[in-house]
Every structure is written in C-alpha cells, then in structure tokens.
C-alpha cells in the first residue's frame, strides 16, 4: 500500500489460474484427497487473515483461486472487516449459498462465519453442488436458518466418516 501525489493504492499479487468454482464445474466433484488438500490451503489463508484481525465474510468457491502451479489463494476481501471493529452486517452480506446462519439473520459475523462458509465450500467440492438451494436468496437464507445440513456422505457414501464430520462441524 502507499500514496503517490494524493492517490492511495494497493499493490496485489497477480494470480493466474481458475476459480475453485470453475474447477468444480470442470470436474463435477473432487476426490476426498483433493478437496482436503484445497480445504487445508484455504484454512491456512483464513488462519493468516484471522490472526491479523480480519474476517473475510464471503468465503465461496468463486473467491478461491487455484493458480497454474496448483497453489490455492483466498481472494476478494471486498467485504472483509476487522474483527476488532464493527462486524454487524448491514446491507453487505456474503453470498447467500455460503452464508452462516448469523449472516443470514443479519447479525454478528466472526471467524466462525468464515469456518461455516468453508464447510459449505467443502460440501460443494465433495458433492458438486451446494447443500441448500432455492428460487430466491431469502429462500436459501431460510434453509440455512431452519434446516439441518445433511452430510455429504448421504450423497456420496464413500466419503469417510471423519471427512463428513469435519464438513458438518
């Protein structure tokens, strides 16, 4: 970051590759091994953000980039907030398919909200689709609030119990 002649700027890394969403669409669904590897890299990125007091608030496959050399990067911190600051959602909220129940209610977002969204992302990697869908954003948000998440193992029986438990955590 810096300032030059009264103009502020941020220098960011250029990451060439594809989004995790595109990758899932190409493959249909990922193997447990591959999904776990990607989830671990996302977790490391979230840990770095959280350790620096930043909550992402919009973790989803569209905001995860897989570089051409296979590295996974968490991108688009556009609605991120400092965890020490006001993290009450106003009109800005993460994508409804990946939003935590707290975000769906318009309430407090913290590190747990990012972890919930990571769980939904893992579910999509393992099954090829999101667990809750609907005709409107409100319908999807209500499902996050009112319905229990079914484990990915119910759709893909070969998913290990341990992986299923992590997604449901």
Where are these regions (language model features)?
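Short proline-rich PxxP-based motifs
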Residues: 145-157
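Conserved C-terminal C-lobe helix
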Residues: 158-169
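Conserved ATP-binding/catalytic core of the eukaryotic-like protein kinase fold
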Residues: 1-139, 144
């Amino acid at each position: 970051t810096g300032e030059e002649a009264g103009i502020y700027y941020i220098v960011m890394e250029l990451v060439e590759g594809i989004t995790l969403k595109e990758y899932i669409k190409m493959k249909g669904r990922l193997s447990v091994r591959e999904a776990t590897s990607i989830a671990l890299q996302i977790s490391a990125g979230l840990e770095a953000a959280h350790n620096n007091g930043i909550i992402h608030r919009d973790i989803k496959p569209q905001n995860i980039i897989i570089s051409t050399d296979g590295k996974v990067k968490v991108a688009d911190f556009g609605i991120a907030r400092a965890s020490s600051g006001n993290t009450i959602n106003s009109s800005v909220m993460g994508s409804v398919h990946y939003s935590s129940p707290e975000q769906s209610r318009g309430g407090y977002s913290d590190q747990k909200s990012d972890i919930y969204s990571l769980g939904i992302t893992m579910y999509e990697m393992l099954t090829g689709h999101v667990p809750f869908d609907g005709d409107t954003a409100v319908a999807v948000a209500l499902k996050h609030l009112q319905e229990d998440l079914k484990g990915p193992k119910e759709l893909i029986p070969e998913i290990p119990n341990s992986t299923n438990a992590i997604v449901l955590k």
